[in-house]
Amino acid sequence: MAEHELRDISIIGGGPTGLFAAFYAGMRGASARIIDALPALGGQLMALYPEKYIFDVAGFPKVLAKDLVRDMAAQALQFGATTHLGEVVTGLRRVDEGDGGHFVLETASDSFPTRTIVIAAGIGAFEARRLGIEGEELYEEKGLYFKVLDPRQFEGKRVLLVGGGDSAFDWAVNLQGIARSIMLIHRRDGFRAHAATVNQVHELQRCGQCELRTFWEVKALHGNGRLERVTIRNSKTKDEETLDIDAVIPLLGFHSDLGAIKEWGLDTEKADIKVDQVMATNVPGIYAAGDVTSYPGKLKLIATGAAEACIAVNNAVHSINPKAKVNPGHSSNMAIFGQKDD
């Protein structure tokens, strides 16, 4: 199928949810494409933590993020779904002709006609929160890093982690045995990280393998073309210290933006898209799945994103062809996989 022919389902987002949506579309015999602003499939997993282990994916005691993406991409693309990477969706229009009409998704350089849409955009376009101090841009990728793509780059380094969430605490654990020393500072004494990981870091501190300080923030960065020292400040006592540091890794969350999707008339709750029990939005023909969605009891997990992708795609297929059952049956009995029905 030509890349710009009318497709049954266009999926916005190439992370785990979008990849599983593409797989399910193919399994249901629907033509599909994935459009993503990032240059590679995998979403946040590849953009932010390809070398981190994930422990809560069914069937894997643990799996590296990059390996999960590799396998999900192989699964997703086996039925001919096309990928359009580095493409930011800038517009949407409706063409009311033919069998009930269709949508056209527009990017800066292309147009993609589609019968239905599944938005699996995660948190949307994202940018790491900066420290907000003078001159930090001078040291970016020269001792100041806002993500960890390869932990080996910190081998033998004196590392300062900044933050109180899962990423900061996870790397305080995962850089053990790699970094020469690890200090983790946070501006408060409460943490958003998982309690088990917080306990791990406290235990590492008791063993002298990590230093955890609360109520401390980065005040200034120092160096000559490359980061050499950091001044930190205690917000309670106003004490300051200047430390010899090789790498500062602020893990303070992200600014996110759904971009043009916000202009489509979709019902939203804060930055999330409201969906019903079949993952349908308030706009007929547009579904959503994964972290971008909001509904009562919503959990933002890879596992739930996969389930939501199934629900969205099966209902999209049914909306295109009302004779198609919503429930696809069991994949173990499907001829499409080379199996014959019993």
Which residues fall in each region the model found?
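A conserved FAD-binding loop/helix module that cradles the flavin
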Residues: 169-171, 292-338
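Short, well-ordered coil/turn residues at beta-beta hairpins
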Residues: 120-122, 127, 162, 251-252, ...
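FAD-site-proximal beta/loop scaffold in flavoenzymes
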Residues: 6, 132-153, 244-303, 311-318
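FAD-binding core/adjacent interface of flavoenzyme oxidoreductases
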Residues: 1-12, 27-28, 32, 40, ...
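Glycine/Thr-rich phosphate-binding loops of Rossmann-like dinucleotide-binding domains
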Residues: 42, 127-128, 170, 192, ...
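A Rossmann-like FAD-binding core segment of flavoenzymes
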Residues: 70-107, 111-114, 176-275, 320, ...
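Beta1-alpha1 glycine-rich phosphate/pyrophosphate-binding loop at the start
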Residues: 3, 7-79, 169-196
